[in-house]
């Protein structure tokens, strides 16, 4: 066998054997050690081919090329006569990747980072990359204050040159901030400055934002907060000189020292605007007016820049540049602000596109647009389209993106990116509700029927006290101008006694149709007609019912029927930021009806609902919600409003913590009534001449309900589901009264039901979930102000409705 000459042993250890300037001609190339890599693939990666004349430099280039493929741990090139013998050791293939001990970082996030570094199942393992990954993960833990954390990559060999890769984490504990010192502050105390930080050395129990756990990113944010605090108060020369973060020997404590130079306070002497103002100098000048002697304020300067950009954006200048340069005069402690504006090009909208609307048709989204294709771009019109899409309630999120058209200097496309949510459900089953007992439900409710935007409902319910069925349809764009048309037909068999109301049975059916007329972006008027037939039976005489029957001329009736035609009207103001789980804005809804000639009854009824959401943070995760509900009705022409049209309160949609419909006036049964008027629910005759007091609610013709709610982020819920779950703490209050009540007509121990001051109150916590079955609402409330006859119900839940 001819002697083999070693040309190069490996990447790190090489011996350069010189074959002369002319080298030798390669007659053949052989490989040893290939397992996963094909011979053809290896040959293609080499710069040397059979028949080439090679020298030392060619051999070095060959080795580098083979290493560059990432498939080999070791490469040796040997010469056997005119044959090149390439000996390789392939890198092992990753068979599996597992993690152990990682609590702060999820597996999915780790896998994404590994894949970004080329480490994935089925790929070759580069051991040098593992060292970088270990160090990068440890640096991450250090940045969040876990200085004792360690990450080790454990590689376990398997047959056929495969390995298992396991990352073992020892996270340790987060270092806590022992003290934060600010050096150089004279105008403000250290306590005042630190009170605006997220990081704290002391955290009161009530502070849900402050944190003693050190995090590098939070410190950077706090330093920016400190800078803004001074700049907003005129300290134009303020500077953070240095920041020291010291670690205790046991790596469990942190000391932070921030060295600052406050400088003096400066006042604005004027604002000078220059540049390409695109003919809008007068409007821009209004945005830059300042009060004489006003302190320099960095936040106001930034807002002024943003306002100028928004102004130009409304006129089609999609990418304006606004830069403010303060000229500081140290002699008189003033700042002159020079604002340079470059409006840039004005843009047309070529196309409006929608992404993510797999169910909703483009036409449903497009009719909500206020920005038109082929027109000048208007940023305010684009934003209005986003608001209108959010208010539809079809989408979890709506985002906009203005994209330049390649090759065009003055055209853009506006893209609305939506994430659809479940807008309805098909259900058939048996359920249980705290207010309805065992119930059987079947139906379809779809707010975006087949993606057309139609709202269609086919529903049926049967429970302890009610059999109800309804078909409803609403076309929100009956005309191209946005006039809506809705209608429904229904049937209801209602056993009032089983619903904790006074004794009667009402079988009713009816229909109504309503037109909605948009007045502007936020206001809609509604008008319509309705018909309802009510057939009452099993009426046990009680005072409120008796008043109504007397006004109808049939005081002794135990059965009664009425056909009524109504004119229905309403007004809605809606400026909520989205249709479900809103976080900002207000909504006011006024509804009413009045009987028209041809009706057996003569009455009117009005109700008003309001809701206002006020976010208290920039991310709208913490929100204060205030709600009210008012109702009033009365008879006309000497008749009373029917008792079955009364208002009720109590339950998950009004005052939580009280049983449904139990707040307010109670039935006082007349002598001879056969009912469960006493507390043990045994049916017997009322024998008291003045009447028998009961706990059966009868409602009233007037109602007032209010609620104050604090919406918070839901614990243990990932960002993916944050828009589907809502947690809140609430305080509810409400009352129902009867303005026509005559205390002299009832026993002396019966309260005055005409008094609106009998207010009930409760407080508790609520959880709402937009589930695939529809909205699920859970609440736990404790009544802390109630009256005799009220029925408490701390835990309540409902399917399919929110307030």
UniProtKB/Swiss-Prot annotation:
Pfam families in alphabetical order: Omp85, POTRA
Per the record, the gene is: bamA
State the signal peptide span. Answer: 1-20
Asked whether the keyword 4Fe-4S is assigned, the reply is no
What family is this protein classified in?
A: Belongs to the BamA family.
Q: Which GO terms describe its biological process?
A: Gram-negative-bacterium-type cell outer membrane assembly; protein insertion into membrane
Where does this chain mainly localize? membrane
Instruction: Give the location in the cell.
Output: Cell outer membrane
Instruction: Cite the InterPro entries for this sequence.
Output: Bac_surfAg_D15 (IPR000184), BamA/TamA_POTRA (IPR010827), D15-like (IPR039910), OM_assembly_BamA (IPR023707), POTRA (IPR034746)
Q: Which GO terms describe its cellular component?
A: Bam protein complex
Q: Which residues form the POTRA domain?
A: 24-91, 92-172, 175-263, 266-344, 347-421
Annotated protein name in UniProt: Outer membrane protein assembly factor BamA
């Amino acid at each position: 066998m001819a002697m083999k000459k070693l040309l190069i042993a490996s990447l790190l250890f090489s011996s350069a054997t010189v074959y002369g300037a002319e080298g030798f001609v390669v007659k053949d190339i052989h490989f040893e050690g290939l397992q996963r890599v094909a011979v053809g693939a290896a040959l293609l990666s080499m710069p040397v081919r059979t028949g080439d004349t090679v020298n030392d430099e060619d051999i070095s280039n060959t080795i580098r090329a083979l290493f560059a493929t990432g498939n080999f741990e070791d490469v040796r090139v040997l010469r056997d006569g005119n044959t090149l013998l390439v000996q390789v050791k392939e890198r092992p293939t990753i068979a599996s990747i597992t993690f152990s001990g990682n609590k702060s970082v999820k597996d999915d996030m780790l896998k994404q980072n590994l894949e970004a570094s080329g480490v994935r199942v089925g790929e070759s393992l580069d051991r040098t990359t593992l060292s970088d990954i270990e160090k990068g993960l440890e640096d991450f833990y250090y940045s969040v204050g876990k200085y004792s954390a360690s990450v080790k990559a454990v590689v376990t060999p398997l047959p056929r040159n495969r390995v298992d890769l396991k990352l073992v984490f020892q996270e340790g504990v987060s270092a806590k901030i022992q003290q934060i010192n600010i050096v150089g502050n004279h105008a403000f105390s250290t306590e005042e400055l630190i009170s605006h930080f997220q990081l704290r050395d002391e955290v009161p129990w009530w502070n849900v934002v402050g944190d003693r756990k050190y995090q590098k990113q939070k410190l950077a944010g706090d330093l920016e907060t400190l800078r803004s605090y001074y700049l907003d108060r005129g300290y134009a020369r303020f500077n953070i000189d240095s920041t020291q973060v010291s670690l205790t020997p046991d790596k469990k404590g942190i000391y932070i020292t921030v060295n600052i130079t406050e400088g003096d306070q400066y006042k604005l002497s004027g604002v000078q605007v220059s540049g390409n103002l695109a003919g809008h100098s007068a409007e821009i000048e209004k945005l830059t007016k300042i009060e004489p002697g006003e302190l320099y304020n960095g936040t106001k300067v930034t807002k002024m820049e943003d306002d100028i950009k928004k102004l130009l954006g409304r006129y089609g200048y999609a990418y304006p540049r606004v830069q403010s340069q303060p000229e500081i005069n140290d002699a008189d402690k003033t700042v002159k602000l020079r604002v340079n504006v470059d409006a840039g090009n004005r843009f047309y909208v070529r196309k409006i596109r929608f992404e993510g609307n797999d169910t909703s048709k483009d036409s449903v989204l497009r009719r909500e647009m206020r920005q038109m294709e082929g027109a000048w771009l208007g940023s305010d019109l684009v934003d209005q389209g986003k608001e209108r899409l959010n208010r539809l309630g079809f989408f979890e999120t709506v985002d906009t993106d203005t994209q330049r058209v390649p090759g065009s200097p003055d055209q853009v496309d506006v893209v609305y990116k939506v994430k659809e949510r479940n807008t309805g459900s098909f259900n058939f089953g048996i359920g249980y509700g705290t207010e309805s007992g065992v119930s059987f439900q079947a139906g379809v409710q779809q707010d975006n029927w087949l993606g057309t935007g139609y709202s269609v409902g086919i529903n049926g319910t049967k429970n302890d006290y009610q059999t109800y069925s309804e078909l409803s349809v609403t076309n929100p764009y009956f005309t191209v101008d946005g006039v809506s048309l809705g209608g429904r037909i229904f049937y209801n068999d209602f056993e009032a006694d089983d619903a904790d109301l006074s004794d009667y049975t009402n079988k009713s059916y009816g229909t109504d149709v309503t037109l909605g007329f948009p007045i502007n972006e936020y206001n809609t008027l509604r008008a319509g007609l309705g018909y309802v037939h009510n057939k009452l039976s099993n009426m046990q005489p009680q005072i409120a019912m008796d008043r109504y029957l007397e006004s109808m001329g049939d005081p002794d009736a135990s059965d009664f029927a009425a056909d009524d035609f109504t004119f229905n009207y309403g007004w809605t103001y809606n400026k909520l930021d989205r249709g479900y789980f809103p976080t900002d804005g207000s909504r006011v809804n006024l509804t009413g009806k009045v009987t028209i000639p041809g009706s057996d009854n003569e009455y009117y009824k009005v109700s008003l609902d309001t809701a206002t959401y006020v976010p208290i943070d920039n991310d709208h995760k913490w929100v204060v919600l205030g709600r009210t509900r008012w109702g009033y009705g009365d008879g006309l022409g000497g008749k009373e409003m029917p008792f079955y049209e009364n208002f009720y309160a109590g339950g998950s949609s009004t005052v939580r913590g009280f049983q449904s419909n139990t707040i307010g006036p109670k039935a006082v049964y007349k002598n001879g009534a056969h009912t469960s008027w006493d507390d043990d629910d045994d049916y017997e005759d009322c024998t008291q001449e003045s009447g028998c007091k009961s706990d059966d609610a009868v409602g009233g013709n007037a109602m007032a309900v209010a609620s104050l709610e604090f919406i918070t982020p839901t614990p243990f819920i990932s960002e993916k589901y944050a828009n589907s779950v809502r947690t809140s703490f609430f305080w509810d209050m409400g009352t129902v009264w009867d303005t026509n009540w005559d205390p002299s007509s009832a026993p002396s121990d019966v309260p005055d039901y005409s008094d609106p001051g009998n207010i009930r109150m409760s407080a508790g916590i609520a959880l709402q979930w937009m589930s695939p079955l529809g909205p699920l609402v859970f609440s736990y409330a404790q009544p802390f102000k109630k009256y005799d006859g009220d029925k408490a119900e701390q835990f309540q839940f409902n399917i399919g409705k929110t307030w």
